[in-house]
């Protein structure tokens, strides 16, 4: 079902572009025109053209106050969300931290977690919270690529003292979730988020959603999700609503606040500091210094250009996908250029 550079001009006519069904039911998306949302339709069309010509975008959704205001590409097509998976896992953690099933202060050693070749005594002191914030100090090889621990000597950094983007941490956080809750990550996602939110394009088949990675490097594998842009946006909308959906708490509000608060600040000359003020618990917090409307904004982030951006000040969620992967990525600067241009379409 294709939507191409679509602004909702009215409820019955999408300029002949979209064949999107009216999914404004109990859990579906309602629509809103740019004018109703306070945005300029002409500028949004220009934004779409600019995005197409200056990024690897394949689909995106901008929702305002829970209603889709702008969409581009096939927003129903699932593809890998890469490291946005970590933010999804943090959402699943919330209820179990709240009810005491997961104790963030428990250590890797106390949980009996080890890995190929064993862990050093100092590494066993890393806590569950250290894993979520990527501050474990455990630089064991990861089963999945994309971390920044290559060349770091094991046993040299005490846990909780230094942020290093570390896929070993994130993968072990998945192991901890299953160990302490007794639930498969994908089954928990389906039961606790997909069904109550009414995600429309998720395929729960175990052939697609399964643990993956190089088991010769680590026992702790990755948990990759395949989601569409509109389903990514709905996860963001749940976060924007402080975890409440149809009157039910799916993710505790205090957990959302904790995860989206800076734990590890980014400061120059760190190149991330231009775009992010820091890292929380599996969420990236936006640098709003030059864009006050982004105060309090945060995002899930995946390789090659996958984003679930939540902008509370504007009641907006912006889901962005570059499904072309390495062949046609959207890197940080192009993405933020697009984000700033989207903000400029406000009246």
Task: Please report, for each region that a protein language model flagged, where it lies by residue.
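Active-site SXXK
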Residues: 66, 80-105, 131, 173-177, ...
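Structured C-terminal helix/loop/strand segments within mature extracytoplasmic catalytic/sensor domains
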Residues: 297-347
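Active-site-proximal alpha-helical segments within enzyme catalytic domains
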Residues: 87, 172-176, 223-244, 306-322
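Active-site-proximal loop and beta-strand segments within enzyme catalytic domains
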Residues: 23-32, 37, 42-46, 52, ...
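Bacterial peptidoglycan biogenesis and beta-lactam-recognition machinery
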Residues: 95-103, 178-187, 194-202, 226-254
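Active-site helix/loop module of the DD-peptidase/beta-lactamase fold
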Residues: 98-134, 181-222
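A short, well-structured edge-of-sheet supersecondary motif
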Residues: 41-75, 308-309, 315-319
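Active-site Gly/Thr loop motif
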Residues: 201, 206, 261-317
């Amino acid at each position: 079902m294709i939507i191409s550079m679509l602004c909702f001009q009215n409820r019955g006519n999408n300029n002949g572009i979209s064949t999107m069904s009216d999914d404004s039911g109990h859990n579906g998306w309602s629509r809103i025109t740019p004018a109703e949302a306070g945005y300029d339709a002409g500028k949004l069309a220009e934004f779409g053209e600019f995005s197409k010509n200056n990024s690897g975008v394949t689909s995106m959704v901008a929702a305002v106050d829970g209603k889709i205001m702008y969409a581009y590409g096939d927003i129903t097509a699932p593809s890998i969300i890469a490291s946005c998976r970590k933010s999804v896992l943090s959402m699943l953690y919330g209820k179990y931290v709240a009810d005491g099933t997961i104790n963030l202060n428990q250590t890797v050693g106390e949980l009996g977690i080890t890995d190929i070749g064993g862990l050093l005594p100092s590494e066993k002191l890393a806590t569950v919270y250290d894993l979520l914030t990527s501050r474990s100090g455990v630089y064991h090889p990861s089963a999945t690529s994309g971390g920044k621990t290559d060349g770091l000597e094991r046993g040299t950094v005490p846990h909780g003292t230094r942020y290093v983007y570390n896929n070993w941490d994130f993968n072990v956080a998945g192991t901890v979730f299953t160990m302490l809750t007794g639930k498969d990550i994908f089954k928990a996602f389906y039961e606790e988020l997909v069904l109550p939110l009414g995600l429309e394009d998720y395929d729960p088949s175990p052939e697609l959603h399964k643990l993956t990675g190089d088991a010769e490097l680590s026992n702790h594998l990755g948990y990759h999700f395949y989601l569409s842009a509109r389903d990514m946006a709905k996860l963001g909308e749940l976060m924007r609503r402080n975890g409440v959906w149809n009157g039910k708490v799916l993710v505790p509000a205090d957990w959302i606040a904790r995860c989206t608060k800076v734990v590890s600040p980014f400061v120059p000359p760190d190149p991330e500091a231009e775009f992010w003020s820091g890292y929380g618990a599996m969420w990236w917090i936006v640098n709003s210094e030059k864009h006050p409307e982004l105060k309090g904004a945060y995002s899930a982030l995946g390789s090659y250009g996958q984003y679930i951006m939540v902008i509370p000040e504007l009641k907006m969620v912006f889901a962005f996908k570059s499904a072309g992967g390495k062949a046609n990525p959207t890197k940080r600067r192009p993405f933020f250029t697009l984000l700033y241009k989207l903000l400029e379409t406000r009246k």
